[in-house]
Amino acid sequence: EVQLYGYLYYYDERDRCIKKKLPGCEPIYYVYDRCNYLVLKQDGNDREAGRWQSFQYDRLGRQVIWGFINQNRPHADWIRICKNQNLSIYFRGASYGSENYGYTPVHRISHLCTPLIINYYDNYEYTTIFNEFIGFLNRPGYYSSFFASSLTSRDKLTGQVVALLNDPSKRDYIAYYYDQRGREVQSTMNSAFGFRNYTFTNYDFTGQPVSVRKEHTSIYRDTPPASVDDVDHILTYEYEYDHAGRLSKLYQTYDNDAKILVAKYEYDEVGRLEKKLTHNETATSTYKYNVRGWPTEINELGMTEKIYYNEDLPQKATPLYNGNIACFSNSIDNNYTSCFNYDGLNRLISTRQYKPDGSEIFTPEDFTYDKMGNLLTYYRVYFDFYPRYMNKLTIKYHGNQIQKAADDYRSVNYYSLRYPDAVNRDVEYDSNGNLVKNLDNMIQRIKYNIINLPEVVAFSDGNLLTFYYMADGRKVRDAYGSYPAGTSTPLDDIVNNTDPYISGTNDWCEDYYYGSGKLRRVTFPEGHISLYNNSKGPLMQYVAKDHVGSIRGYWEPGDTSLGKSPYPSYYPSGILDNKVDPYHPFALGGKEFMS
């Protein structure tokens, strides 16, 4: 029982955690130096790969290098080697050469390490080691210089080298520049795939940004950029604040388009957002709260949502006083009211939906749990002349990990959570507890990177997805393709889009999203600029969000109603009721959804 459900921690004589065991995972080992700095770490997947994660610090205790070493020494050996040594390093710059990237290697760990993130502080001498960094740029209306030798950059992060986990030889080179008050006034990035992003910032005397200029250079242009000043797109924001320092107006300019008042914000007496006027004040959104500050009503263009707790409840709703939502209604869902019931541990045990006249819609959901809070059963009903089960799902666990899910009813509905009972064990996990096989979803294998993010997903029908992450966790690209029958799918080798079976790629570079080599979307705080219809040019699209942050629709300047077809609708439990448009994958609670 302890091995299945327990969280186990082991400590050395100096009360440092040297081993940790989590449910469903192999142990994680930790190694420290004499100064109590964590210098090595190894989880279950690291052991299988024969590597240790390495952490190197300067003499001020700042982490300067994180990477891995391909040497699978036993845990006890590394403890013995490191525990009496001070393994801190310091920056010597170009005078020390490019060895260890300007830092002094003081131990075999430094020599063996393949770096994934390199941090530079205090000064800009690192630019003499790497030619890929972009220096300080001058733009009219923004700072024309930075303070390289001033005390203002002391203890500041001035540069970063961030590796692409799929191929650590490809890296982002990011530089940060500061003014005399230590405020970041400019950052430049030369990305692993060749994109370039520059950000320029002006501040008021209180330290709040009043204007931000973002420049972007694409890798999909017809000719290479002539210089670092040759950019493709410019996105400029201007900010105004009220007497309390709250954002009151947000202006935006995209390329050569006219400046637009994206949003005007108004607040109530206690500082809560009360009204929002968008796109040159042509559309109004209002927000209401109860005496506890909980949101009770959201009014957007073409969407009204009401949230109930313990007051003004519709019929058949049970009042709740602990912050749980008793029910809510949304005009996009035909003003149906969704009501919730919870157990004594605040777990959702049932949902019911009602029409405005109080009659029940036959889409109830029921849930049961085990003592650990794991979902054991899920029943869902729909009405087709008479009530029928859409799902009657039973889930079996080993510890807290799903091993098998069986559904007694199989519906043709797209999101009916179909669980074909194909084999005795549908789901498998790796040594870190990551899902590596799910036969219910035709997932044959998933390969993960060093930070436990999926790198390759292979499906049993020959389809393949490859994800590209930077070492700091940013997703920058995905590639997709289909392998013909009989073709071996090499999970460890599919790391670039030169593979003959890769049919397309998508790129993310900060605010810019590219699909198959074409700029498709530019995000901004209240929506996005759509470029799918090139005949119309850039098209502003504002989004309407519900109480959980999911996008329920969008509207364009001149619209009087909400377009909702690309965006998700879902059951009260959150299970989707329709497909999500692949061009808007982040519509569901801000999380990426792929199908």
Which residue ranges define each predicted feature?
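A motif-centric feature for acidic-aromatic and gly/ser/thr-rich catalytic loops and repeats
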Residues: E1, E305-E311, K536-S595
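Intrinsically disordered, low-complexity Ser/Thr- and acidic-rich flexible linkers and loops
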Residues: E1, I219-V231, F385-Y386, S411-R418, ...
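Beta-turn initiation residues at beta-strand->coil junctions
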Residues: E1, Y9-E13, K19-C25, R34, ...
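Surface-exposed acidic, glycine/proline-enriched linker/cap segments
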Residues: E1-L4, D77-C113, N310-C327, Q403-N424, ...
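A residue-level detector for well-ordered beta-strand positions
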Residues: Y9, Y30, F55, N119, ...
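Glycine-rich, acidic and aromatic/proline-enriched surface loops and short helix-turn segments
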Residues: E13-R14, T206, A244, Q401, ...
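Repeat-solenoid scaffold signature
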Residues: P23-S110, D242-N299, N330-D384, M442-Y483
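Extended repeat-based solenoid scaffolds, especially LRR ectodomains
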Residues: R92-Y178, E305-Y321, A326-S331
